UniProtKB/Swiss-Prot annotation:
Entry's family note: Belongs to the RimP family.
Descriptive protein name: Ribosome maturation factor RimP
PANTHER family in alphabetical order: RIBOSOME MATURATION FACTOR RIMP
NCBIfam families named among the record's database cross-references: PRK00092.1-1 (NF000927)
Compartments (UniProt record): Cytoplasm
Species the sequence originates in: Shewanella halifaxensis (strain HAW-EB4)
Organismal lineage: Bacteria, Pseudomonadati, Pseudomonadota, Gammaproteobacteria, Alteromonadales
Function per UniProt: Required for maturation of 30S ribosomal subunits.
Amino acid sequence: MATLERKLVEMLKAPVEALGHQLWGLEYIQAGKHSILRLYIDNEKGIFIEDCAEASRQVSAVLDVEDPITSEYTLEVSSPGVERLLFTAEQYKAYIGETVKVQLTMPVAGSRNLKGTVTGVDGQMLNLSVDGNELIVALDNIRKGNLIAKF
């Protein structure tokens, strides 16, 4: 996770939790005037559109005061969804036995894109079973990871 994203998580975690939700994670996608700050919030009871709107108002107020992003951007707040992005070791641990897809910064076993079953998490290392092979991936090598839904 980039330095700005870490700073944003620290800044926005408390306002989201004050609403009774968990800040599941966030993405900051830089694209000039079309940059996006996307927050994912979660709750044991599920997230509804009203929850997203309320969180957006709270978070906007904090961002207006703190002003951590100097360029223009659009704020989006949503639930993580079924094929949720995974941001932390704890989140990967919660899905041991489930299938995930990860995009890597540096290749592992000759690939930057892996799809496999989470078999464990040891500190900041993710254990994945990919096509019957056990691979170990450093969490800081994961550019993007998400759960794959089973239907």
